[in-house]
Amino acid sequence: MHLVVCIKQVPDSAQIRVHPVTNTIMRQGVPTIINPHDLAALEEALKLCDTYGGEVTVVTMGPKMAEDALRKALTFGAHRAVLLTDRHFAGSDTLATSFALAQAIAEIGETFGTPDVVFTGKQTIDGDTAQVGPGIAKRLDLQQLTYVAKILSIDAASREITVERRAEGGSQILRTGLPCLVTMLDGADAIRRGRLDDALRAARTKVVKWSAADAGIAEPANCGLRGSPTVVKRVFAPTSREQKARQIDTTNKPLREIADGLIAAIFADRPALKHDLGSTGQQGAPDVDRES
């Protein structure tokens, strides 16, 4: 079984800072991590490999420093790592990113064997779009299972996979044929501790580095800014709002008087609310017959 896992190196969101003047993200000095949802995908792929055998290939698109994320994935137990790096990829939005990764996965299939399952995280913590995984599936014509919490089983004979998928209000048990693409949720299983032999093997393993041409991308115009119909116009910090607290003495006061005082205080801070409520005929506190 051949499992391909897409990962991304992202800034540690707990330590991201925004420049107070330019309102841009200050990346200098901010440590990077593997996207948490991608770690969940990697762990699920490694578990399948433990159960059914096979190999796990990790792939990422990014600058040369993204090799650090791939080497970390190798220490967890991945067998092979591919870095897709080229100046043509700079400024890629989700459409251009899914195109480049789909081309790379197709090339991985030609070079190392067709993937049975392609894994991605549900989304990245620096983009939060959840679009790249489905975009890859569409380009590779793969069935897609999104928001997956757990892989329940793989039937090698019938070439089918069964998963538990989170849905609004509960969970779904879904089954589809292989090959397919799965987007994993963070939190299902923590990434394993790498073993010593995995760390030693990772140190000896050479990361495969592909340019756009190496990945079979004949037309770089589909990549990077040229292939991106969307561009981030501005990154900004939310404006702070002064919060006020008001203490009201309710000692030995009837409920009606307390309610009227609270409503008057709210209307004093938000005059527009009084106008809106007045237009619906809802003014003042409701009648209170008794205290309870």
Curated annotation (Swiss-Prot):
Instruction: Alphabetically list the UniProt keywords.
Output: Electron transport, Nitrogen fixation, Plasmid, Transport
Specify the signal sequence span: none
Family annotation (InterPro entries) = ET-Flavoprotein_bsu_CS (IPR000049), ETF_a/b_N (IPR014730), ETF_b (IPR012255), ETF_beta_N (IPR033948), Rossmann-like_a/b/a_fold (IPR014729)
Q: Which SMART domains match?
A: ETF
In which family does this protein belong, per the annotation? Belongs to the ETF beta-subunit/FixA family.
Q: Which proteins does it associate with, and in what oligomeric form?
A: FixA and FixB form a heterodimer.
Q: What is this protein called?
A: Protein FixA
Gene name in the database record: fixA
